[in-house]
Amino acid sequence: MKQGTVKWFNAEKGFGFIEVEGENDVFVHFSAINQDGYKSLEEGQAVEFEVVEGDRGPQAANVVKL
């Protein structure tokens, strides 16, 4: 599992990016967020996640808010 910080997240569109120190930003889709109810992330929020290979490159999976 990697740890990072939410760089930005557009709740209306349901996606954003997670910043990982020393690495490229990782795409995150709302469907990858592990929580019940409304799935969204806040800018600057610390998260833990796995990286999987998506259709357009690396993306976050199993995202957990810290």
Curated annotation (Swiss-Prot):
It comes from the Bacteria. It is found in: Cytoplasm. InterPro entries: Cold_shock_CspA, Cold_shock_domain, CSD, CSD_CS, CSP_DNA-bd, NA-bd_OB-fold. Gene3D superfamilies: 6.20.370.130, Nucleic acid-binding proteins. Induction: Up-regulated in response to low temperature. CDD domains: CSP_CDS. The keyword Cytoplasm applies. Its main location: cytoplasm. Residues 1-66 form the CSD domain. One of its GO terms (biological process) is regulation of gene expression. PANTHER family: COLD SHOCK DOMAIN CONTAINING PROTEINS. Involved in cold stress response and in the susceptibility to an antimicrobial peptide of human cathepsin G (CG117-136). Regulates yellowish-orange pigment production through a still unclear SigB-dependent mechanism. This is Cold shock protein CspA. It comes from Staphylococcus aureus (strain NCTC 8325 / PS 47). The gene is cspA.
